Regions:
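Terminal targeting signals and extreme-terminal segments of soluble enzymes
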Residues: 2-196
Length: 196
């Protein structure tokens, strides 16, 4: 039995690939200058002490107004929190060619990430100071393909149920024309959290 050698993958791009009309069509939106709401936002993570000292709605509002940094994943994934009310959160996102899957659409994981973020933050917005939470279940339904040409999308989430130990929320992802792209639901466990 041979030993697997981890050799670097060599990708050869032919002239045919470089001038494929489908490739050019997919990459064309990259040249547009659409921007998210706040391109100068701070990125980072606050200490657990700060996180647990504030109720969820106040903490998330701090991310909106710059008092707290936005989570690093949101920068990596080109998504941004833009609205917070207790039990309701809105994100926007920019699906670009860097998130393409092999068949030329935006990978479903990108849509799942923006939905997960919005649905989880929706639950976070209901937390009391000293409470923590974690996602224990998530379900996503994909309705239409997301493409780089889709442009900036909007993800709206709302709280469905908030108990003392679990909460459920749902989210919907729309294109700029209001067409539904994907929707999902999420269950989070709520627990007393410690600062250490």
């Amino acid at each position: 039995m041979g030993v697997f050698q981890n050799e670097p993958c060599q990708i050869e791009i032919s002239e045919r690939d470089l001038y494929n009309p489908r490739t050019l069509e997919l990459l064309e939106p990259e040249k547009r200058t659409e921007v998210l709401q706040n391109e100068t936002r701070q990125i980072g993570v606050v200490s657990r002490e700060v996180l647990l000292a504030e109720d969820g709605s106040f903490f998330l509002t701090g991310m909106l107004n710059g008092r707290h940094p936005c989570a690093p994943y949101s920068d990596t994934m080109d998504i941004e929190l833009v609205e917070v009310d207790e039990g309701r959160v809105v994100f926007v996102g920019r699906p670009t060619a860097r998130y393409l899957n092999p068949v030329g659409t935006i990978h479903g994981g990108w849509a799942a990430t923006i939905l997960d973020g919005a649905m989880a933050y929706c639950v976070h917005s209901t937390l009391k100071a000293g409470e923590g939470y974690t996602t224990i279940e998530m379900k996503i339904n994909y309705v239409r393909p997301v493409l780089p040409s889709t442009g900036i999308v909007r993800c709206e989430s709302k709280l469905i149920h908030r108990g003392s130990r679990t909460a459920t929320s749902e989210g919907r992802l729309f294109d700029k024309h209001g067409k539904l792209l994907a929707h999902g639901s999420e269950t989070c466990m709520i627990f007393p959290a410690e600062a250490t």
